[in-house]
């Protein structure tokens, strides 16, 4: 139960029956492989329901969101004729994964090569660290660019000090990071919505909602094979990662490897 159980495939099979598919934890490390009309698609951040025209996809506050990864995934889907922007909604409370998170991930794995955590190198762990430390930048910060630029400068000073002085690697460039984020900021903020309210309204309307986990149960930060785990709660993160009341969940489907 450390991944590759077929979660993405089962989600894809169930999406014909639902109106919403929700990602509530993890980052761009899901790696859900889907086959639709004979074409293979790998989704790492965007919910698997995006391939179904009848489904609205939601990214909840528990997901750490990489602007670069989101743009790449959107581009790949749109090039294949998938309507993403009108059917994907994002919580403003999603922490952002930025280049310094990725740099820190790689620096740590190199430093502790003899006993690595086997991180994906995508900055997911460091982004969750920033969230817990209450210093991270979030999607909602993109609405105020002046404030975002100031916050980015402060946090990048913090990261670059560690990268240069402890890990002995190159610092992350502030201006490039800022320019790259601002280049896609309008696209991201255009998809921001109140995910909790949408889910509550859907529940009251009797709409079917499917919550899509990104990792297996044994990778749960609290209940998995610590320390070789991910940085979030897997099944248990549904409520806190989306704002959906836990008592409103009426069915849980677990996917188990047969070998």
Swiss-Prot record:
InterPro entries found in the cross-reference section: Adenylosuccin_syn_GTP-bd, Adenylosuccin_syn_Lys_AS, Adenylosuccinate_synth_dom1, Adenylosuccinate_synth_dom2, Adenylosuccinate_synthetase, P-loop_NTPase
> What biological-process terms (Gene Ontology) are attached?
'de novo' AMP biosynthetic process; IMP metabolic process
Give the molecular function GO annotations: adenylosuccinate synthase activity; GTP binding; metal ion binding
Give the cofactor note text.
Binds 1 Mg(2+) ion per subunit.
A Gene Ontology CC term for this entry?
cytoplasm
Signal peptide (UniProt feature, chain positions)? none
Keywords, comma-separated and alphabetical: Cytoplasm, GTP-binding, Ligase, Magnesium, Metal-binding, Nucleotide-binding, Purine biosynthesis
* Superkingdom, natural source: Bacteria
Pfam families in the cross-refs: Adenylsucc_synt
Residues recorded as binding Mg(2+), renumbered to this chain, are: 4, 31
Task: List the pathway annotation.
Answer: Purine metabolism; AMP biosynthesis via de novo pathway; AMP from IMP: step 1/2
* UniProt cross-references to SUPFAM superfamilies, sorted A to Z: P-loop containing nucleoside triphosphate hydrolases
Enzyme class comes to ligase
Query: Which SMART domains would you find in this protein's record?
Result: Adenylsucc_synt (SM00788)
Name the residues that bind IMP.
Answer: 4-7, 120, 134, 215, 230
Assigned EC number: 6.3.4.4
Annotated positions binding GTP: 3-9, 31-33
Q: Which residues form the active site?
A: 4, 32
Location in or out of the cell: Cytoplasm
Q: Which reaction does it catalyse?
A: IMP + L-aspartate + GTP = N(6)-(1,2-dicarboxyethyl)-AMP + GDP + phosphate + 2 H(+)
Q: What does this protein do?
A: Plays an important role in the de novo pathway of purine nucleotide biosynthesis. Catalyzes the first committed step in the biosynthesis of AMP from IMP.
Relate the assembly described in the record: Homodimer.
Q: Which family does it belong to?
A: Belongs to the adenylosuccinate synthetase family.
Its recorded name reads: Adenylosuccinate synthetase
Q: What species is this protein from?
A: Aggregatibacter actinomycetemcomitans
Task: Read off the lineage from the record.
Answer: Bacteria, Pseudomonadati, Pseudomonadota, Gammaproteobacteria, Pasteurellales
